């Protein structure tokens, strides 16, 4: 069963508390000019930011967002005349300075029927340096009657000066068991099956909720099998890099990152204390270095680098570290 895309932040029970906090803050006075919504991937950043915009524009302040007024109808269709989304331009992975300048021009105009205006920057970490500097000036002197919302899963990639001008809302993630229960109720399947998927994909419920359980389990098994074969020397890094260089590139790296992280956490546990001996520390250090490489490659994927070459270098280093450390992820983890 595929429940389809998430339509509202109210479908995510772990967001009810931050939503209540926002309502309480708005009831206590004037809303801030700028908000920074942060949280780990899978927490529901975009739907929460959309909820903020709907709340801001709704004409029924007692029930906002009411879902039935003209503003809510516009927002639901993605066509509100006083809301301006700011996203990377087509065929680009950046938000550019000319887009920010155009946004400033739009916000300087009178709103439709004198209404308030808003902008949503998502994903905000895609602002390039010039665009971020231009946006900072807007934050320092925000247009009257406007709300600026930035949403990002990588706030450290925004300039500190931009972050400091915003009120930050950090969204929580549910416990893995809660995520699995939610996925089971929404998408079908058992919580145990979804926990197996999340053990590799990471605790990112909204990222996998549109997947069929069977497909998610198959992809999880394939990634574990690839990691096992790489560690055993049964797969060549060059050939595996060619296979991984597809539309699942990022999810594969996320899965590899989680497998390594899980291994390192288990190695630090009391069940395998021998791995913490002085003689074995270089092996663990090599695993941490591979983990850093995986995270760096995920960031580089958003730049015009040779992705296939980067994957080959990463998987070659991973194979050497896996063999040295005796890395052997279990298919039934």
Regions from the PLM with identified roles:
Residues 1-55, 63, 71-74, 144-146, ...:
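Charged, glycine-rich active-site and insertion segments that engage polyanionic ligands
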Residues 62-95, 156:
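AAA+/P-loop NTPase substrate/partner-engagement loops
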Residues 21-26, 94-118, 125-126, 130-138:
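Conserved alpha-helical scaffold flanking the Walker A/P-loop in AAA+ ATPase domains
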Residues 80, 100, 132, 163, ...:
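ATP/adenylate-binding site constellation spanning eukaryotic-like Ser/Thr protein kinases
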Residues 86-91, 108, 117, 170-174, ...:
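Localized chelating/binding microdomains
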Residues 30-31, 76-80, 112-115, 142-145:
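Short loop/turn elements that form and flank the Walker-type P-loop nucleotide-binding site
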Residues 119-123, 135, 146-152:
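Structural recognition of the conserved hydrophobic beta-strand(s) that form the central parallel beta-sheet
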